[in-house]
């Protein structure tokens, strides 16, 4: 996906002039970035004290909302499992791809009325995204439990004859059932030792029924064989079998239990399919909601920081740059040259973290212009 730089600079004689200067410096001869105006409406400014406090709160809100957006995106990838290549086409904002949404950003007046104070708007965003985050935790927990239980049952029916469930392999006819004296055991015999088994099983212990062993199934390494003997000889037979590298499985033929396991697996599989569609729909809708909220937080941050940096009356142009990956360093230099007059202390510093009291810029690059990164690379594929 894509990285954007959301910047602002004060209006020259007009904001259009600021825009034209940026375009001339970054696109005319050197193709350093693809640019778009970033439309921020006339928001209520409030007092300077409120703006300084809000700057800090918005930084925290930005990190929280970005985290929520990434969690929804990542969970979408987890839920789609084998269709992970389809994840990107499901990550939309207002029905369009993320790049289109950001480059054509329009403030959502219905969701975030600009008659409200900046603090109120930030609280509306925080409340909405907190709800999404909480709902995601609950839905993910329920679906993960269901998926985990199903995987555990599926795992039982996979693997080698030594470990897997034998319920799907054996039939009633393979056993002597309801006998007071006789019992049928299931034995895993390595293929290399099968000849030895056929020669020796009748004499491994006393009271083995002659010619009672048949091959019921096989995998790459072993055969599954049955053998019938007297109940009182079972312990001795197990011991001797182990000495000869034959593994006696703990298995009792119980039709009701086997039927219940099968029904449970079918139920879990059906439940998973039933929940899958609504869950993916919920993720799509709420990814869009969270992403839209995130870009509105970025807009709020640009507005607040621009007023704090450039003063009143409000007069700045917000601009969205999509840097050319190969020329990012050059773009930084060009922007620095273009705007270094805005802050003499930053003129010699490019990409150097600084603490500026009153402005929330610690742990972040400081430039003479307002700058926020928007990274649309929201997925971490394992």
UniProtKB/Swiss-Prot annotation:
Gene3D superfamilies the UniProt entry points to: 3.30.70.100, subunit c (vma5p) of the yeast v-atpase, domain 2, Vacuolar atp synthase subunit c, domain 1
Domain of life the protein comes from: Eukaryota
Residues with the N-acetylthreonine modification: 2
Stored Pfam families: V-ATPase_C
Keyword Ion transport belongs to the record: yes
Disulfide partners: none
Keywords: Acetylation, Hydrogen ion transport, Ion transport, Transport
GO MF term set: proton-transporting ATPase activity, rotational mechanism
GO CC, alphabetical: lysosomal membrane; vacuolar proton-transporting V-type ATPase, V1 domain
Assembly behavior: V-ATPase is a heteromultimeric enzyme made up of two complexes: the ATP-hydrolytic V1 complex and the proton translocation V0 complex. The V1 complex consists of three catalytic AB heterodimers that form a heterohexamer, three peripheral stalks each consisting of EG heterodimers, one central rotor including subunits D and F, and the regulatory subunits C and H. The proton translocation complex V0 consists of the proton transport subunit a, a ring of proteolipid subunits c9c'', rotary subunit d, subunits e and f, and two accessory subunits.
PANTHER family: V-TYPE PROTON ATPASE SUBUNIT C, V-TYPE PROTON ATPASE SUBUNIT C 1
Role played: Subunit of the V1 complex of vacuolar(H+)-ATPase (V-ATPase), a multisubunit enzyme composed of a peripheral complex (V1) that hydrolyzes ATP and a membrane integral complex (V0) that translocates protons. V-ATPase is responsible for acidifying and maintaining the pH of intracellular compartments and in some cell types, is targeted to the plasma membrane, where it is responsible for acidifying the extracellular environment. Subunit C is necessary for the assembly of the catalytic sector of the enzyme and is likely to have a specific function in its catalytic activity.
Family under the similarity heading: Belongs to the V-ATPase C subunit family.
Name of the protein described by the UniProt record: V-type proton ATPase subunit C 1
Species this chain originates from: Xenopus laevis
Gene name, Swiss-Prot/TrEMBL: atp6v1c1
